[in-house]
Amino acid sequence: MTRAGGVLIVLLTDAVPAMGLGRRKGDAMHAQVITFGLNGITEEQFRQASRADTPTFASLPGLLAKIWLRDPETNTYGGLYLWDDQEAYERYIKGEVFNAIKADQNLKNVESRDFGVFEDLSSLTMPKLRAV
């Protein structure tokens, strides 16, 4: 685990196969960025609540990785999600966990954007990552 500029960076190693790199053509990973502001809670309160939620995220079907994002200066928080495929992403945004995030009164201005992934290029530039 490393901290750079106030951002927690989780280093992963030996995750290339687990992240689906080298998969068959057509099995496209999907990325999602969710951002929001904190509403009436501190960053530490958010961190504690989020820590309690980590088993839920870790068990989401099709979720390859979630990176927790923070920028306290602009009150912007969120997550970068890497999904096994677009179908896994779509199940998530229609499901209970994402709907709970959108309805959470402690979060404001919840926004979500999704992206396709160039798996061939990503496989050439992805550092060896290992969740700790």
Could you describe each region identified by the protein language model?
Residues 99-102:
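A common structural junction motif
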